[in-house]
């Protein structure tokens, strides 16, 4: 990895959602430091903090701390929940017409991951003005899962609905689907974060970086309506 980073001035770090992500971060930031990388742009996560009560946010905070401590210059990008998650996991809603949520009516200002990528690319092209900055990237509105499903219903013309489920029932459903415990624990921490209102904030940062209003869920649902068609 040290050889790979030789001569690199700006490094964009996006770690996979994997049990080893802290190990990956440790090795990567050490190598970047040793290679003399000038600026590290790190894609983190909403609410990332060493002091977070939520498991995944706390782990993201640990990685952010490594970036801050080992980088000559750094910028942190903290995106919210991705709109694309509803596309990637569209099957239950597509086949049953029902989306089950354990978020208790909590709101998220979901963001189009393509716009996160555009913002990160803009920073990486000219990182100096963003040195030491942390940007929270969200969509333009905070909405409940029921409101998101309503956007999808309007886009597809289907009778879709969101049904509440308990945190325990959600865990059991994820386990039955074959997800490992480490994934379930972290997804549960995100659901708790939403239920407790910690994901409902709307930040102006993405609009400033893009120079325009970010995509809303209604527009996104219209563009991707085929994913939820029966």
Feature locations, PLM:
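Short amphipathic alpha-helical segments at helix boundaries and their inter-helical linkers
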Residues: 192, 196-204
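Oxidoreductase cofactor-interface core, primarily capturing Rossmann-like NAD(P)-dependent enzymes
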Residues: 6, 17-26, 30-39, 45-161, ...
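Conserved Rossmann-fold cofactor-binding substructure of NAD(P)-dependent oxidoreductases
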Residues: 1-9
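Short linear loop/turn motifs
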Residues: 187-193, 220-224
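Periplasmic-binding protein-like
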Residues: 12-15
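Amphipathic terminal alpha-helices
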Residues: 205, 210-230
């Amino acid at each position: 990895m040290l050889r790979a980073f030789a001569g690199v001035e700006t490094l964009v770090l996006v770690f996979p959602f994997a049990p080893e992500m802290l190990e990956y971060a440790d090795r990567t930031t050490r190598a970047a430091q040793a290679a003399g990388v000038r600026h590290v742009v790190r894609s983190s996560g909403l609410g990332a903090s060493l002091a977070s009560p939520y498991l995944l946010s706390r782990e993201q905070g640990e990685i952010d701390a490594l970036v801050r401590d080992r980088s000559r210059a750094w910028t942190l990008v903290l995106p919210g929940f991705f709109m694309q998650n509803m596309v990637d996991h569209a099957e239950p809603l597509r086949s049953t017409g029902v989306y089950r949520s354990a978020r208790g009516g909590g709101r998220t200002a979901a963001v189009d991951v393509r716009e996160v990528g555009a913002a990160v690319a803009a920073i990486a092209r000219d990182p100096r003005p963003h040195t030491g900055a942390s940007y929270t990237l969200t969509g333009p509105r905070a909405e409940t899962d029921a409101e998101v499903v309503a956007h999808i219903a309007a886009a597809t013309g289907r009778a879709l609905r969101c049904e509440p489920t308990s945190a325990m029932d959600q865990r059991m459903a994820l386990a039955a689907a074959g997800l490992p415990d480490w994934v379930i624990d972290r997804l549960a921490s995100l659901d708790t974060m939403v239920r407790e209102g910690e994901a409902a904030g709307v930040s102006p940062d993405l609009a400033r970086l893009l120079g325009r209003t970010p995509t809303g869920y209604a527009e996104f649902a219209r563009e991707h309506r085929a994913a939820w068609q029966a």
